[in-house]
Amino acid sequence: MKQTMDKPKRSFRRHLTPIRRHLSPIGSGDRIDYKNMSLISRFISEQGKILSGRVNRLTSKQQRLMTNAIKRARILSLLPFLYNEN
């Protein structure tokens, strides 16, 4: 027969760190649109690549809209696909 020994129960308190909410770099009045070049240019690297959502601090929905706006601006020749290093 097995003898079971009950371990004393301890209450564990997790040290909760406060979650910081980062303010979105896009203001409430700014609209994500392919024509808004001043906004779009902030989310493109020097090489012309689209920056990731972590770097941008955008939500996933905002990142999706921004990516579509950048691609649309590239197709309409408002933005270059590549930047020359010359």
From Swiss-Prot:
Subcellular location(s) per record: Plastid, Chloroplast
Note the Pfam families from the entry: Ribosomal_S18
Q: Name one GO molecular function term.
A: structural constituent of ribosome
Question: Where is the major localization of this protein?
Answer: plastid
Q: What keywords is this UniProt entry annotated with?
A: Chloroplast, Plastid, Ribonucleoprotein, Ribosomal protein, RNA-binding, rRNA-binding
**Listed GO cellular component terms?**
chloroplast; mitochondrial small ribosomal subunit
Residue ranges the record marks as coiled coil: none
- The answer to whether keyword Nuclease applies is no
A Gene Ontology BP annotation from the UniProt entry: translation
PROSITE patterns, from UniProt? RIBOSOMAL_S18
Q: Tell me the first and last residues of the signal peptide.
A: none
- Chloroplast is among the record's keywords: yes
The record describes its quaternary structure and partners as: Part of the 30S ribosomal subunit.
Similarity section: Belongs to the bacterial ribosomal protein bS18 family.
What protein am I looking at?
Small ribosomal subunit protein bS18c
Q: Which gene encodes it?
A: rps18
